[in-house]
Amino acid sequence: MKYENDFLLKLYKDILETRLLEVKMTDLYAESRVPGHIHSGTGQEAAFAGVLATRKPGDYFKLPHRVVASAYLVGDPLDTFFGEILAKKTGNSGGRGGINHLGRLCDGVLGMSGTLGCDAAIPV
């Protein structure tokens, strides 16, 4: 199968940006700046970037409990993303929930899964 260069470049950019966000989030946690917890997905970025590369307008997506930085790929602005993780009012739920409350229904993000194996894919 042959892919267009533009598609491959965007996929690489998405993988790189997600990795950088995961590393930043891990660094902030190591500095004790994250009041809650994180589930680092470092090393798993390509799997989520690849899945998200197939999204079409109107599709819905539920974030995994790892690679929460994939929220950025589906439209979560950085100030909102880091606001929630750092317990700031600019977060998705006003900084009250941390990574468990990342989500943006307006971008088709239903939220995240915090438990392994708790979700089933349901086509709509």
Per-region residue spans from a language model:
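Charged, compositionally biased N-terminal leader segments and the immediate start
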Residues: 1-11
